């Protein structure tokens, strides 16, 4: 497991950063409500996400979908009940990366006897956790690369600058359902 102080320190810093980012994401969305343009599953973000409930909850059967859900989520996808199709212009890459968090939200939702429809507040919060996780992962990987070439101080300054002076904070905390933060983590790896 963790056999030296450097690894333990890195582990603690990573957990603290992840906890901070999750807190900031939850706090940012605490008063935004659901099914509006400020929510985690609205418009493009819902279009990326729709693969998950379609696959794991509804089995691509549109007859079980709540009425007007596509409109309530900002038209990020379209439910065509006449032809039994869910239409989205986005690929499934973001949904694949959100899958572990979706499954966790589904288990929590069913356990707490909430609606397991894929769009209740627990699923919205899962998107915040996913964004925070991939922000932390990307920063960790870039930090590890920098530590190989530079000293710890420079690596820390660069990673803090990335969060504070680029759009990473915005996409990792505010717009957690957009593809940007997931792409960042993948490029960092």
Region locations from a protein language model:
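Transmembrane alpha-helices of multi-pass, membrane-embedded glycan-processing enzymes
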Residues: 90-94, 98-105, 125-141, 162-166, ...
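Membrane-water interface at transmembrane helix exits
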Residues: 102, 106, 143-147, 174
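Start-transfer (signal-anchor) and selected internal transmembrane alpha helices
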Residues: 1-30, 127, 147, 155-156
